[in-house]
Amino acid sequence: MKRIKIFDTTLRDGEQSPGCSMNLPEKIEMAKQLEKLGVDIIEAGFAIASPMDHKSVQAIAGAVTNCTVASLARCTKGDIDAAWDAVKEAKHPRIHVFLATSEIHMKYKLQMSPEQVLQRISDMVSYAKSFCDDIEFSAEDASRSDWAFLAQCYSNAVAAGATTLNVPDTVGYSTPAEMAELITYLRQNVTGVENVDISVHCHNDLGMAVANSLACVKAGATQIECTVNGIGERAGNASLEEIVMALHTRRDFYDAETNINTKQIYRSSKLLSTITGVPIPPSKAIVGANAFAHESGIHQHGVIANAQTYEIMNSMDVGIPQNTMVLGKHSGKHALREKLISMGYELTDEELESVFTRFKVLADKKKNITGSDIEALVLHRRNTAIGSCRLISHVVNAGDGVPNTSCIKLQREDDVMEEVAIGSGPLDASFKAINRMLGLDIKLDSFSLNAVTDGEDAIGEAVVKLEDANGRRYTGTGLSTDIIESSIRAYVNGINKMMEATA
């Protein structure tokens, strides 16, 4: 059975998706979770893009030890220098260089001839190789390139020292049959291809990124580039969880396996959703709320009789928590720790203390606390630690015939501040009070509220997108059984992220 490497680009290509930006602590937390998940390569960012990107790649390179850490770079010495400087302290560094090879890109974007492109590939792959043994070369827009020319580009890259050849379907144009045929052609026509990995990077513009990637595995690809939850530019990238579980569930067909710990899939998906504020669609394969739900009476009867009648996977295989043990206000820290361990969470004493404090607050409001409630507390634990502003209390007055008024009390470092404001509703009044208190000029770009657990006393997760005076956007999330409180907490969380980014 052949081994397929999983190249995760959530922190680079995925983060380019609108609304999916992350700050440095969030990127590091996500990288550590990807390491637990068992991905082979983490593409940490595009080091030359900005000082913050460089800092993020550098920090991730120092934070993980089991994964290869890659930085993207164009085929220029400046990009390659920046990439190497960012990943050089990684235990397993990789430089990922790319250059477009399709006629339309060469003519209109690069303004280079095919001969110049071939020479640039040879020169820059060789230059990258002078720093690092592990070099990946991507031919941007490969799926729309002339195949014979593409094979020559890859042959030049191998001769110059590339160890991985990536074949991107950059605009999501190809079909599974076409991608498989292209991989077969390259395996037969690239000089030295037997000594390198063949990778694929498929976009989802026509909804075929996962199907295209899997077709390439059948054709001989040995690495798949993907993102958690399929996030990415435009319609997104190939979804990691779908790729991995397709290979896992259909080993009989693909004769392939990965190094992924599938029990960490759901946790990785939820963490990313919590960080970015982008909800997981209920019908999302593998990790959606309805992925293992059965409402039809015929289906329910079949599952009760034998789960395999309608289920090809077990929810526990992807780490979806089981609500078999409930905790309450009399449960102690030891019981909480044991529950967390059974769910796959190993927290430090400091992290456990933070979660336990909020667990006791929740237990006073909610009779039975399930695994889903606890998971929500764990995933949101960072929000209480980010930034200098903390919500102390809120009082709102709203109703027909009375002004919508909110009194907010915040603590900022050692100062306690209080402000009252009137608005068009209780949330508008609350947000205005916070803005006035802190002297901020920010705009609420979007707001959403979702129940993250079940029941009439469900925990609500509020997500706000804030925009500052310079057009920069920040995502804030908040958690509470009180939807007003969760919304205010989300707003404060977003402000803290903004203050941290502009400090």
Residue ranges and their predicted role:
Residues 4-6, 16-41, 54-63, 77-198, ...:
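Alpha/beta enzyme core
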Residues 174, 180-305:
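Catalytic alpha/beta core domains of metabolic enzymes, predominantly
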